[in-house]
A protein has these predicted regions:
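ATP-binding N-lobe of GHMP and related small-molecule kinases
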Residues: 1-97, 115, 119-124, 159-163, ...
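Glycine-rich beta-strand-to-loop/alpha-helix junction loops that act as flexible
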Residues: 101-102, 241-246
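DPxDG-like acidic metal-binding loop motif
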Residues: 97-123, 128, 139
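N-terminal pre-core extensions flanking Radical SAM catalytic domains
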Residues: 245-254
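Conserved, helical-rich catalytic subdomain that frames metal- and/or nucleotide-binding sites
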Residues: 51, 142-238, 253-263, 269-271
């Protein structure tokens, strides 16, 4: 079985409250994009309970057993009699970018195992397992535009489509750790109801649909502001950092030659 975990972007991100459990409440829109990893899952018949994990592409800086893909298998293997699997991940979605690549891989692993072994898990059950792996993992089970709140695990489907826009995504070479990004945040009430995002023309998003992490992260990674300015110069009608960074996306009415503008950075463009 070969599946293709996709990335997401955040459209707007308000950090609204520090919780008593040490986490933060936030409000954001998760939007899936077609930047994808490649995940191959092969059943090892005659053997039980083992996940053999290998990877190519962007190096994964953690032991195989601590990778979220392996953890996804382990969660299901404790409750179901699973054959061992050989799993290969070709990593394309950058880390430290705010794109949810690791969470996507984990969620797609759950969905893939459910199909491979005919476990019969429904969407709600899969989202429950995904929530044990990370706050944004359940989104990748749904994988359509949502308004997310709480820690990001609570979601409401919204009506939003960017299919009429060309998207350019740029990842500076320096990444950002989520804990570091949160350290510079002062929680505040959301200044816009992101559930209404689909009613606001994209041309009016600037200054209204903002990412609170930018004020925390850009002083540490000034390249982010440089990328934003270049995207604007190329004609972007809306530019934002996604998640806690460091990737930045711009929405355009037209195709642009973004690779020439960012020869040293990771660049992805929508079709």
């Amino acid at each position: 079985m070969v599946i293709f975990p996709n990335a997401k972007i955040n459209i707007g991100l308000f950090v609204t409250e520090k919780r008593s459990d040490g986490f933060h409440n936030l409000e954001t829109v998760f939007y899936p994009i077609d930047l994808r990893d490649i995940l191959e899952i092969t059943e090892m018949k005659g053997e039980k309970g083992r996940c053999v994990f290998t990877s190519t592409g962007i190096p994964i800086d953690c032991p195989p057993e601590k990778n979220l893909v392996s953890k996804a298998y382990a969660i299901l293997a404790t409750e179901y009699d699973l054959s061992s699997v050989d799993v290969h991940l070709h990593k394309i979605i950058p880390y430290g970018a705010g794109l949810g690549g690791g969470s996507a891989d984990a969620a797609f692993m759950l969905v893939g195992l459910n199909q491979l072994f005919s476990l019969g898990l429904n969407e709600e059950q899969l989202m429950g397992y995904a929530a044990r792996l990370g706050s944004d993992c359940p989104f990748f089970v749904l994988n359509h535009p949502v308004f997310a709140f709480g820690k990001g695990e609570l979601m409401e489907t919204i009506d939003l489509s960017l299919k009429d826009y060309h998207m350019v995504l740029v990842k500076p070479n320096r990444g950002v750790s989520t804990p570091e990004a949160y350290r510079g945040i002062t929680p505040r009430a959301a200044s816009f109801d992101l559930r209404e995002l689909g009613k606001l023309p994209v041309e009016q998003w600037t200054g209204v649909v903002v990412n609170d992490f930018e004020n925390s992260v850009i002083p540490k990674v000034p390249e982010i502001e440089e990328v934003k300015n270049i995207l604007r110069d190329l004609g972007a009608i809306y530019v934002s950092m996604t998640g806690s960074g460091s990737a930045v996306y711009g929405l355009f009415h037209h195709l642009v030659e973004a690779e020439k503008a960012f020869p040293e950075y990771f660049v992805w463009q929508s079709e």
